[in-house]
Amino acid sequence: VACVYRTCDKDCTSRKYRSGKCINNACKCYPY
């Protein structure tokens, strides 16, 4: 499954993370 930046970011923010980014085609959440 390809990582989509907008979807990843929205998923992370909905889980109380600050933001999300695609790294090596995987979604990574960032708390800061």
UniProtKB/Swiss-Prot annotation:
Major location category of this protein: secreted
Domain of life of the native organism: Eukaryota
Name under which the protein is recorded: Potassium channel toxin alpha-KTx 10.2
GO molecular function: potassium channel regulator activity; toxin activity
Tissue: Expressed by the venom gland.
Aromatic residue of the functional dyad, annotated site positions: 30
Compartments it resides in: Secreted
Protein family (similarity comment): Belongs to the short scorpion toxin superfamily. Potassium channel inhibitor family. Alpha-KTx 10 subfamily.
Site (Basic residue of the functional dyad): 21
Gene Ontology cellular component annotations, sorted alphabetically: extracellular region
PTM annotation (Tyrosine amide): residues: 32
Keyword Disulfide bond attached: yes
Signal peptide: none
Keyword rRNA processing: no
Cystine pairs: 3-22, 8-12, 27-29
Domains (record comment): Has the structural arrangement of an alpha-helix connected to antiparallel beta-sheets by disulfide bonds (CS-alpha/beta).
Functional summary from the UniProt entry: Blocks Shaker B potassium-channels (Kv1.1/KCNA1 sub-family).
Keyword vocabulary terms for this entry: Amidation, Disulfide bond, Ion channel impairing toxin, Neurotoxin, Potassium channel impairing toxin, Secreted, Toxin, Voltage-gated potassium channel impairing toxin
